[in-house]
Amino acid sequence: MISVVEAFEFSTSFARGKWSENDFVMVKGPRWDNFGSWLQMDDHIVQNVPANASEKDLQTRMHSEAYVAMCFAKKIRMAKKVICSSTMSFDYRMAPLIVIAPTLGKCEKTGVPEFREHWEIVLYDKGINVWHHTWENGKPAWVKFSYLLEEYLPNTKYQLNAVITDTPKGQMLEVGCNGKKFGCFLPGLGKEFYLGIIGCEGRNRFYDFKISADKGDALTE
């Protein structure tokens, strides 16, 4: 079912009692069996990881336990421009992110939603990376597609912005954070995709999530 809208705005705070889980779908990472969850704090959400886990462990041997992802439950069909933003922070070095996924697969073992091809816009202490994750012969693969070198501090709130624009050459991504911007094309993205957030490689805190779509864009059920 396609619901065409004149314009679309979605905005939620992740403060306690201010958001609905029904607006989102939890998504499993394709590299691990772990299917994570969020821990609700007063003004944000953070991955639900073992309380005694060190930050270094969450970045290395406990990487899978730190991975928690969810997407806005409705798929965007873009006409011109879509803007997605989230206010986030990290406790140690990395790596809260915005995710763009053309489609969602299903885990063969459990049937829960699982990422296939997707793009990650990742904030960390040395800058921002854009990673392109693919699904080849039933296995995940990934490559760094673009990046910005910049210093970002732990325990500091940043608003990460992703602007996706439809152009004659395909979908163009412009990333902005704390006054810095960079951009790249996303070949093969297409005009339909899910938008969401992922916490990984350390404790990541998310304070809000917003999507704004231009006139003529649509939502798919």
Specify the residue positions occupied by each region the protein language model found:
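Short tryptophan-centered beta-strand motifs in secreted/extracellular beta-sheet-rich domains
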Residues: 14, 84-86, 155-167, 171-175
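Extracellular beta-strand elements of beta-rich domains used
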Residues: 14, 209-214
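Secretory/extracellular carbohydrate-interaction modules
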Residues: 49-135
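Short, aromatic/His-centered strand-loop micro-motif at the edge of beta-sheets
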Residues: 135-159
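Flexible glycan-contacting loops in extracellular carbohydrate-active proteins
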Residues: 183-211
